[in-house]
């Protein structure tokens, strides 16, 4: 989906999921360092990203316009966000930001992306 209002849909879903989910690490929730699942009431970064991806797929988005990105924050912590292709270009949906952000606007070191079932290294992504 890259229809005329796809950015607005992505913005709404980002806001809805960020408001609905309270951050809680996998260690706190599941007693394991990593457990990828869609967020219920609680979740960590990849759970937010998976929930946003699922909501966009349900809204008619094509899988090839969505990607789960693994990156590192300025402090070196692993982080996961959702890349989306919209009518206004490529944006990142991140649980740390209220609005979709351009990859170049974020202080992350990009590592890899899962898009349409294939992991790929990210070089020069931002």
Segments from the language model and where they lie:
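A structural boundary/capping signal
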Residues: 1-126
């Amino acid at each position: 989906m890259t229809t005329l209002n796809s950015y607005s849909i992505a913005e709404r879903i980002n806001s809805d999921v960020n408001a609905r989910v309270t951050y809680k690490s996998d260690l706190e929730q599941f007693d394991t360092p990593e457990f990828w699942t869609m967020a219920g009431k609680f979740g960590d970064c990849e759970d937010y990203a998976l929930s946003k991806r699922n909501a966009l797929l349900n809204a008619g988005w094509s899988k090839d316009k969505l990607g789960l990105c693994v990156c590192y924050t300025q402090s070196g912590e692993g982080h996961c966000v959702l890349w989306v292709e919209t009518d206004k270009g490529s944006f990142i949906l991140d649980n740390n930001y209220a609005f979709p952000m351009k990859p170049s606007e974020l202080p992350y070191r990009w590592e890899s992306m899962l898009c349409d079932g294939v992991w790929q290294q990210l070089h020069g992504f931002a």
